[in-house]
Amino acid sequence: MSTPTRTKKLIVSPTSVRKRVQNQNLTNTTYSTNSNSSRYRDSEENFLNRQQQELKQLHDQQLYELQELQEQQINEIEELSKQRSNTRIRNVFKVLITILVGSIIYGTYTNQFQPNPIEPFHLTEPIGQTWLHSLKDISTNWYHIWSDSFKDLARIKPLSESQTMPAGHRLHEKQILEKTLRRHQQEQDNNNNNKKTIENQMERMKRTDLERAIKEKTFFLDPTHYVNEEMIKQEIERQLKPHPGAPTPYNKDVYNSQNIYYPSSDAIPMVREKIENLENKVLDSVDEAIYKFGQKSKELLHNIQEKKEQIKEKLNDEPSNIEKEFNSLIKEIEKANYNIFKDLKDNYGEPTIEKLNELRYKFNDAARESREVIKNKIESAQAIEQELAKNLKKPHADSNGHPKPYPHHHLLNQENQIDENLIIV
């Protein structure tokens, strides 16, 4: 018979277990403190290495950006120098061609359009002279274009010596980069401002019919009934704003945190009615002001026409005065021609063909000017005579239709004198 094996039971006391756990915790704490100190040293070294690498990368990036700026400016200067040389050669050829064409036309003018002798006088300007004036204008325009092409280089400023410093001057390089970034931002802001101006112009073109009508009719308004766009906008805002104590048909979320008013869908018909009423009021006031202005203008025109008729009755002796002025003008011209002859005789001495040609040019110019003055005087005198012949009354004319002198002494002794600014002849 097999005897049963006995198993020994392991009896563990709680005190022994507590001691074992304490010893294990002590070993763990010592190990953790040692591992934490070594890990902290490693992290500090990694942080310093990483910071050095970042500083080095930033320094390299700044140097690279400076090199790119220098290369960009060098390329721009080279391109502008090429454009300048090309424009210079092109404009020189254009100037040479204009000089050649001008000389050819001037040669044809001097050969074909010789001035006529002193009698008869020609007041019209030769064709070649007009061509010369047009060529002169074209040549001046090309010269201005050519001179403006040299001003392109002034826009680009090359890098100064202070901007190409060694790598150690990090603060100075940072200032340079900030300046360049600020300049680029200013250029972008300028472009945005240009876009805003274009958008504002488009918005002005898309104005409503009411604003357009008011803008067209404010010129005819009386100063007491003057209306401008700001007044209309203020009136619209005042009428659209609800009363604080009254019940409103608007939603709860009409006013947001910034107290900005947003009308709901229920309020749109009311707003439309108020705007239409305001439009009608404004248009009625405009029409009333225009009617008053028309009445005033009619009265002024009536008064002016009455004074005009009174003044025209005074001007019966005007043709004789014009004839006297015409004769005195002819005498002055003859005297001037005589003085020219005398001066030329004293200065030039004996006449030759060249001197006669110079005289011919000078007398052509003098005759052209004098004939134009005489022609203008004759036209004004004829116009006055025609108006007087129309407006003169029948009892003050002869059987042949010639005007008689009108007794106008009683008009000159009136108490109410006539304003000279209202004379319309």
From Swiss-Prot:
Coiled coil: 41-91, 172-208, 292-340
Protein's membrane topology: Single-pass membrane protein
Protein name: SrfA-induced gene G protein
Region named Disordered: 393-413
Subcellular locations according to the entry: Membrane
Glycan attachment residues as annotated in the record: N25, N28, N36
Record has Membrane as a keyword: yes
Organism per entry: Dictyostelium discoideum (Social amoeba)
Gene: sigG
